[in-house]
């Protein structure tokens, strides 16, 4: 099944903190089965690249990771999606190469403005907890919370716990520089996972855009990892954005 133009679409799906490209396995398989091209890069210091974790790995590093996928794969007319922290990354990428991005999709993700870091727009209690816990890793990295923190479904929770990796503190602390070019991308979508055992830092972003004509907004009755909890619906939203 192609997109509305009748052609296969190209997707770049960016994961969040403590994760890796592996988290998009279900969604990527669904999209590929419909004839689409899907890239699921793993950010430096995460997943199968966890051996590269270092004090200097920051948000700029991760933006460069994804920019290089576009460069070396010569990607254009891309649906670019980010989950959670990945919203910081895709905002930076899209701002730098807006002419190569056809659509932006935020999957229960941070939606930053110019000059903001993840710490600036997260719930203060979360920020304080992450900084304190980084002390267990020499102040370099934040250990992963359990899957239950994100209300991951019972089937996927054990795998999430097994594969989660410490996340570089500098990536959370670095402020993002945006020119506003990413806002010229006409197709913008936000997906919010509504069921968490605690206050969600992502609901304010959903509330900000849900009635904005420039955005398409969806609320999924699931936890934070929408691509694991509702892969079929996530794939449908991504395909609709193409």
Predicted regions and their residues:
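Gly/Ala-rich beta-loop-alpha elbow adjacent to hydrolase catalytic centers
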Residues: 81-82, 86, 90
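Short beta-strand/loop motif that positions the catalytic acidic residue
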Residues: 184, 190-192
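Residue in the alpha/beta-hydrolase core beta-strand immediately N-terminal to the catalytic nucleophile
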Residues: 42, 79, 102-105
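Conserved loop-alpha-helix segment in the C-terminal half of the alpha/beta-hydrolase fold
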Residues: 194-221, 225-228, 233, 241
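Active-site loop/oxyanion-hole signature of alpha/beta-hydrolase fold enzymes
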Residues: 37, 45-79, 95-96, 121-123
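Conserved HGGG/HGGXW glycine-rich cap/lid loop of the alpha/beta-hydrolase fold
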Residues: 6-50
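Active-site nucleophile elbow and catalytic-triad environment of alpha/beta-hydrolase enzymes
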Residues: 162-181
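Flexible "cap/lid" loop of the alpha/beta hydrolase fold
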Residues: 55, 95, 99-101, 105-146, ...
């Amino acid at each position: 099944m192609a997109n509305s133009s009748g052609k296969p679409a190209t997707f770049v799906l960016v994961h969040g903190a403590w994760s890796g490209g592996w988290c998009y396995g279900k969604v990527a398989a669904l999209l590929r089965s419909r004839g689409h091209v899907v890239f699921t890069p793993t950010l430096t210091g995460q997943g199968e690249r966890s051996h590269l974790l270092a004090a200097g790995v920051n948000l700029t590093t991760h933006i460069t990771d994804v920019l290089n996928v576009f460069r070396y794969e010569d990607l254009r007319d891309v649906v670019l999606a980010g989950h959670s922290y990945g919203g910081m990354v895709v905002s930076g990428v899209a701002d730098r190469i807006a002419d190569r991005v056809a659509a932006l999709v935020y999957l229960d993700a941070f939606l930053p403005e110019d000059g903001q870091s993840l710490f600036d727009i997260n719930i203060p209690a979360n920020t304080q907890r992450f900084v304190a816990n980084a002390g267990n890793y020499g102040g370099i990295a934040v250990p992963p919370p359990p899957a239950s923190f994100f209300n991951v479904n019972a089937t996927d929770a054990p795998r999430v716990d097994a594969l989660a990796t410490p996340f570089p503190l500098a990536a959370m602390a670095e402020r993002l520089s945006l020119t506003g070019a990413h806002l010229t991308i006409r197709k913008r979508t936000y997906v919010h996972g509504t069921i968490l055992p605690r206050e969600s830092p992502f609901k304010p972003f959903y509330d900000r855009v849900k009635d904005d004509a420039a955005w398409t907004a969806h609320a999924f009755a699931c936890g934070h990892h929408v691509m694991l909890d509702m892969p079929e619906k996530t794939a449908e939203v991504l395909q609709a954005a193409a």
